[in-house]
Swiss-Prot record:
Any one biological process term the GO annotation gives: cytoplasmic translation
Gene: rplF
Family, per entry: Belongs to the universal ribosomal protein uL6 family.
Name of protein: Large ribosomal subunit protein uL6
PROSITE patterns: RIBOSOMAL_L6_1
CC terms in the record's Gene Ontology section: cytosolic large ribosomal subunit
GO molecular function (one): rRNA binding
Organism: Cereibacter sphaeroides (strain ATCC 17025 / ATH 2.4.3) (Rhodobacter sphaeroides)
NCBIfam families in alphabetical order: L6_bact (TIGR03654)
Amino acid sequence: MSRIGKKPVPLPKGVTASISGQTVEVKGPKGTRTFSATDDVTIALEEGTVKVTPRGTSKRARQQWGMVRSQVENLVTGVTAGFKKELEITGVGYRAQMAGNVLKLSLGYSHDVNFEVPAGVTVTTPKQTEITVEGIDQQLVGQVAANIREWRRPEPYKGKGIRYKDEFIFRKEGKKK
């Protein structure tokens, strides 16, 4: 069983944390993030670190212990370095471009797909076939990238579609005569 919760979360220079009840607020150079923990754990600020301890020995308390510690670590990472997902578009005529707060995708449909970018996330297109999603909220960055990818998932025969930069597409052989 993992004991990731035992390890305290260090606060780098330029990052401050404040705890009020079960809510942790982390401020850093990229912004401010908050997280509300369950009553199964206790959160304390000790000597430049955030320490999470379980209340009791129940299974739920032990589960929340590691999860809350990981969430606090993600808050610190988000306000210092941020999170980034890169997508690649593969296919003839498939391309993307930003127009204000809308990502326009040409994906082989009879119409262009207009994807509204939510607040808290920055989407850029360095090339017509590359999309970069950045932000301080790991869950939101991942969800936006997944929503963009969902418009045209990579297919296994030619590999056409939108995929993550490091994703491997298992290729299938076509029919034989």
